[in-house]
């Protein structure tokens, strides 16, 4: 496993031994000079940009905040991502989210009843996801179904997509995309995130293995101004104000 250098910090109230366990598990090497810091607080694990402290910490929270609000008051099956993966009454596809990020869309699909396996190759992001899942699993309200429906695999999608069993009906891709220079200051979260992981320059290579793995379809989330992934025109799309969800059929002929 290749090691990633990041500043590792522990705040008052955090378990003092947890940081070294975290570093060992995810292959992290502490670098006091690094701009990016992974901070263990008494409540959770956070990612911070040390040269821009006003941006605050980035963390995964499935229990409260915007995720809880989206689960309770969002569009439910009417949400664009739900329509794109094909959720219908009596049909809840199994989904592999091959670019999990902070797990937002994966959580929405799991909350609607889908079984979702998240793939995340960046060890820092995987550590944040794992921390959010751990807290979510312990929650009295969402824990019982979250444990059943939402899981994490720390692996590169370029290799993992070939080997996943059983095959999911849907593979979901939401690769990082370079933001327009002219756009307003990118949301703080995106700025911190892109400082860590950059753009997914190899994302075009995901479409073919995703279509070979999915038994029904691949869904690719793109900014409205972005070219289709790998330059391949989509069969259909669900369009929102600022994004579109491009839909591609599976490339595997179903058995007769």
From Swiss-Prot:
Catalytic activity reported: guanosine(1516) in 16S rRNA + S-adenosyl-L-methionine = N(2)-methylguanosine(1516) in 16S rRNA + S-adenosyl-L-homocysteine + H(+)
Record's keyword terms, sorted: Cytoplasm, Methyltransferase, rRNA processing, S-adenosyl-L-methionine, Transferase
Coarse class of the protein's main subcellular location: cytoplasm
EC number: 2.1.1.242
Gene Ontology BP term (one): rRNA base methylation
Compartment(s): Cytoplasm
SUPFAM superfamilies xref list: S-adenosyl-L-methionine-dependent methyltransferases (SSF53335)
Residues at which S-adenosyl-L-methionine binds: 104-105, 120-121, 156-157, 174
Domain of life: Bacteria
Disulphide linkage map: none
Function: Specifically methylates the guanosine in position 1516 of 16S rRNA.
Protein name: Ribosomal RNA small subunit methyltransferase J
Source species of the chain: Yersinia pestis
